[in-house]
A protein has these predicted regions:
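Helix-loop-helix units of permease transmembrane domains in multi-pass membrane transporters
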Residues: 60-92
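Juxtamembrane loop-helix boundary motifs flanking transmembrane segments in multi-pass membrane proteins
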Residues: 3, 76, 80-84, 111-115, ...
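Alpha-helical transmembrane segments and their short interhelical loops
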Residues: 80-154, 200-211, 216-219
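Hydrophobic alpha-helical segments of integral membrane proteins
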Residues: 1, 8, 65, 69, ...
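Transmembrane helix segments
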Residues: 25-32, 141-183, 187
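Alpha-helical membrane-inserting segments
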Residues: 24-28, 54, 58, 101, ...
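Transmembrane helix-loop junction
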Residues: 26-30, 63, 72, 107, ...
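Transmembrane helix-boundary elements of multi-pass transport/secretion proteins
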Residues: 2-67, 95, 115-122, 172, ...
Length: 234
């Protein structure tokens, strides 16, 4: 966390795009409509969760792997759990920082409304939907070098947002996006967020899709980690 804070652009960048999207698109176009403003805020929260975790874990892990102390740290008898727990705590802190401007803009500049129960539900769902993007970031970080990790994260970033329906209101995306989105991690995640903050129905296919992505990405991340271990210590 201290290392991340020493690079202000990494912290500021994670919060900039979701907040900028709120100010550029949500506030002027749907800010006065309570329903659409609430759904749009949920979409931007999903956007922030995806982008923060893709870059925090994808690029962060890849950069850590090339540091001279990394082989020594990974050989310590404490094992990988303390380091992974620290990385998770750091990642959640950065994710919370990136979400804060979105929530403040929604509160101060739009008509978005949430009951206390819906707010708590949205918080829980936010942590749940972060899991596939954390695993995706780890898979990237343990698979490729830092420069390639930046490229891979950038290549995945916008297509996942667009194809997942994060750029439109519920039901407002082109037909092919509406058909594809529930089966993508972004589309499944945002549908759970919409259900948490509004009257959007809970879709079983989105839940099953999210579980499937967690299993698949978890397997890929574990494989990439073990492959990296084998290369370093075999």
């Amino acid at each position: 966390m201290i290392e991340t804070a020493r690079t202000p652009i990494a912290v500021i960048g994670s919060a900039f795009w979701p907040a900028a999207s709120m100010l550029a698109f949500v506030v002027p176009f749907v800010g006065s409509d309570p329903v659409y403003a609430t759904y749009a805020t949920a979409s931007m929260i999903t956007f922030a969760v995806m982008s923060t975790n893709l870059f925090q874990y994808g690029v962060g892990v890849a950069e850590d792997r090339v540091q001279p102390w990394e082989p020594y740290v990974r050989s310590l008898p404490t094992g990988a759990l303390p380091r992974f727990a620290g990385r998770l705590l750091s990642g959640f802190a950065l994710m919370a920082f990136s979400l804060l401007p979105v929530v403040l803009i929604a509160w101060l500049c739009t008509a978005a409304t949430l009951s206390p129960l819906s707010f708590l539900t949205a918080v829980v769902v936010t942590f749940i939907i972060s899991v596939p993007f954390i695993l995706m970031g780890l898979a990237i970080g343990y698979s490729v070098p830092p420069k390639a990790a930046v490229v891979v994260a950038q290549v995945l970033f916008f297509p996942l947002a667009f194809a997942g329906g994060l750029m439109t209101a519920p039901g407002g995306a082109p037909g092919f996006v509406e058909d594809l989105a529930p089966y993508l991690p972004t589309g499944a995640s945002v549908r759970l967020m919409w259900a948490a903050v509004g009257d959007y129905p809970v879709e079983i296919r989105s839940i099953l899709s999210l579980i499937a992505w967690i299993v698949v990405l978890g397997g890929v991340a574990l494989w990439a980690y073990r492959r990296d271990e084998g290369r370093r210590f075999s």
